[in-house]
Amino acid sequence: MSTRLLAGALTFAALLPIITHAATSPTTASLARPAWLDASVAKATADLVATHGEAIRSRAERGVRQAASLWRAEDGDAAVFEGVVRTHFIADPATRDTVFRRLDALHEQLDGSLHEINRAFRWQTDLDLGPILPIDEAFAGYDPTAHVNDDFFANRIAFAVLLNFPLTTLDEKLRDGPKWSPQQWAEARLADRYARRVPADVAQQIASAYSSADNYISSYNVWMHHLLDERGQRQFPAGQRLITHWNLRDELKAQYSAKDGLPRQRMIAQVMERIVTQSIPAVVVDNPHVDWQPYANTVAPAAVNDSDRAVPTAMKILADREPDTRYARLLGTFQAERLADPYSPAAPTRIARSFDDERELPEARVEAMLVEVLSSPLVRRVAKLIESRLGRPLEPFDIWYNGFRPRGAYTEAQLDEITRRKNPTPAAFAADIPNILTGLGFSPQRAKYLAEHITVDPARGAGHAWGAARRGDKAHLRTRVGPSGMDYKGYNIALHELGHNVEQTFSLYDVPFHSLEGVPNTAFTEALAFVFQDRDLELLGLARPDARSEALGTLDDFWGAFEISGVALVDMRLWRWMYAHPAATPAELRAATLQIARQTWNEFFAPVFGRKDVVLLGIYSHMIDRGLYLPNYPIGHMIAHQIKEQVHRTGNLGTEFERMSRQGRLTPDLWMQRATGAPVGPGALLAAAEAALEQVQ
């Protein structure tokens, strides 16, 4: 997962009064367009033309109209508005260019400094540095950027930007963007910053809601040695503590290489189902002092000790289920996001902002791409191949089948031994980054350059990549390393996060303007990270790709895209449901999530797996703490395959990765056209999967 500017834990009960009160704040009066404004716009525009000449009319009309669109009555009367226009409209092209460069440089310092404050405030909650205290949660829930938008409209900087640089629609970017220079793109991105005027209190409440959800997810671990099967036997090693959903899913995948892994896979799937349905006993979450039989759903005091934690004196071991906390956190993010809706007339829902503004890919197009993968005839053919390789009928958890990967030749214990020996600490992984990068095809000079711009921290959660926001700062790779070293799951995730960090470094340090920093949307950085992650065994010296292994890798990509497309579709349908039922309770949201997960499963997965009403598509943690993040993953799989084909054509991952990352934040299709020669879509992956099937069969 990639984080650039992350928006602690308020309980849902504590959050609701704040949200309810704030929801009344955007009054009709405060959002209404002042009655005098149209006449003032005409007068201010005419005055500019009279002063500077007819040549600036078109630019003046657009700039004044843009400024007026976000002017509020509290900003001042007609005389004040016209004064702001006279003061801040720039007629001279050279002066306008100078102002743009100053704005770009100063916004970099602003973004970077606030970003570093935010990172520091979240240090204790994000990193594995001991217990989280209430003061840590309070700092983590504070957003230092919350007042910037308010302040910059109040001090007229935002209006200066709107008067001089064009607010462009997505249609305009798609139509005209291919002809724009890098500076024109940067000017458009600068103006995009001020396309909405969300009040500071709303921005802060959104940040607090997501921080609360993130803290909940980051602490949601299961102690696996304390899971008991129907015979009361322990199936997992002592000390194994897995975070939901990432480590649970990856442990399930790891069991494909174990001869006796099937019972453990079934048990993990049962644990996942208990989490999604919230029938999991609350006492077992991140608790090594309780034994749990997930099939019978019974709990008892732990009969073994595999933790250095003291037993809490007041702990009561009860089977009472988790009280819909998972869905209370999700509902908290939804209610917070709704507060921004009145201030976003062009994108009046979180759904519209997620797709139209952030991804710049329409929701309908994304859904069509997901459905194209989910309904492909290739799914049944690949499923039959998996079934034949397993020698048994498919079970629902086989959506995570990973037997196409060469790692299937190694047990998880063998891989853990290698990675723990190689990376006993986060510092050891950091020291190995230059070797990893040269192994991926980067020159020694570029590998050294990148390693100098990346630092490694011990993650409290599964791990994430937090890029820098100004030149001079470093990207942070957060990875989970246990007392005995980095296990294979951690290494695989760390490579993914390293891919993010490398992209983040190139797309910050090596773009011509700060306003162009980044990639088109998060799916692109996920795609680039997948390219790193897929080379894990090769980097460990355990596998060399040949034609057959590459074909199997393509089938693995396809099966992964199939699985995550279903998960993403559940995420999208769930947000639509919340908007249709804004007064829902956590219990009602739980019921809706289960219904949507089952319906999506029955539509696309049951015909393949032969079992209905499965809820596993609802297990992903990002569904709770990242607000419509999940569609980035299937889009990322599609993009990743297009990138891999381009790398295969040229033969050098390092050179191509750098070339692509340095394009900056263009629109998705333009970025992809310049990177690979084709727009974003599943076509390349589907065609490659069909060819791979022919080769493997």
Residue ranges and their predicted role:
Residues H453-A462, G482, R611-I624:
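Flexible, glycine/threonine-enriched loop-and-boundary segments that flank and lead into catalytic domains
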